[in-house]
C-alpha cells in the first residue's frame, strides 16, 4: 500500500512537514511504499487525518493535522554519503539524545535542508526516505521492532 504525501516548509516553526495529499498544503507530492504501520494511538496525538496512511519510520505526530513537531528528513542516498563521511549520523543523533554530544547539530540541519529540495525537486527521489528527529519532538517513531530508539529525541 502506498501513501501519497506533500512536503511543505513551515516557516513559522522552520520545519518540513508531511501532509496527506488532499489536505490543505503546498509542495511536491511524494509517493512511495514505505511499509505498513499500525495507526497512532488516539491519545498520543491530536485528531488527525493520517490513520489511513501506511508509513514506517515516522513519528506519530506526523499524522497530526498540525504536522510533525520538529521533523527533519532526507533521502537514504544522502545519508550514505556526505553526512556519514566523518561519522555515522545515527550514532551522532543517539549520543545527542543521551546528552553525550557537545557538538552543535546546526551543520546537520543546514545540510539536510539544503539537500532535501535538491533531491526531491530536481532528482525526484521520493521512495527511499530516512527520517530523523533532530530535537524538540516528544513523540516516538512508528516502526517495526528494531533498534529505532536512536531516532527519537530526548
Swiss-Prot record:
It is found in: Host cytoplasm; Host nucleus; Host mitochondrion. It comes from the Viruses. Pfam families: X (PF00739). Residues 25-49 are annotated as: Disordered. It comes from Hepatitis B virus genotype F1 subtype adw4 (isolate El Salvador/1116Sal/1997). This is Protein X. The keyword Transcription applies. The keyword Transcription regulation applies. Keywords: Activation of host NF-kappa-B by virus, Activator, Apoptosis, Host cytoplasm, Host G2/M cell cycle arrest by virus, Host mitochondrion, Host nucleus, Host-virus interaction, Modulation of host cell cycle by virus, Transcription, Transcription regulation. Multifunctional protein that plays a role in silencing host antiviral defenses and promoting viral transcription. Does not seem to be essential for HBV infection. May be directly involved in development of cirrhosis and liver cancer (hepatocellular carcinoma). Most of cytosolic activities involve modulation of cytosolic calcium. The effect on apoptosis is controversial depending on the cell types in which the studies have been conducted. May induce apoptosis by localizing in mitochondria and causing loss of mitochondrial membrane potential. Residues 28-38 have a biased composition (Low complexity). One of its GO terms (cellular component) is host cell mitochondrion.
Amino acid at each position: 500500500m502506498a501513501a501519497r504525501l506533500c512536503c511543505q516548509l513551515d516557516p513559522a516553526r522552520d520545519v518540513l512537514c508531511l501532509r496527506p495529499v488532499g489536505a490543505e498544503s503546498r509542495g511536491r507530492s511524494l509517493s512511495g511504499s514505505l511499509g505498513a504501520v499500525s495507526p497512532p494511538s488516539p491519545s498520543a496525538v491530536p485528531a488527525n487525518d493520517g490513520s489511513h496512511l501506511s508509513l514506517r519510520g515516522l513519528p506519530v505526530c506526523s499524522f497530526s493535522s498540525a504536522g510533525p513537531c520538529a521533523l527533519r528528513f532526507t533521502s537514504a542516498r544522502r545519508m550514505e554519503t556526505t553526512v556519514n563521511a566523518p561519522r555515522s549520523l545515527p550514532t551522532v543523533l543517539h549520543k545527542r539524545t543521551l546528552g553525550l554530544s557537545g557538538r552543535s547539530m546546526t551543520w546537520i540541519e543546514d545540510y539536510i535542508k539544503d539537500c532535501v529540495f535538491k533531491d526531491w525537486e530536481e532528482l525526484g527521489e521520493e521512495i527511499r526516505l530516512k527520517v530523523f528527529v533532530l530535537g524538540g519532538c516528544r513523540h516516538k517513531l512508528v516502526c517495526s521492532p528494531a533498534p529505532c530508539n536512536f531516532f527519537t529525541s530526548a
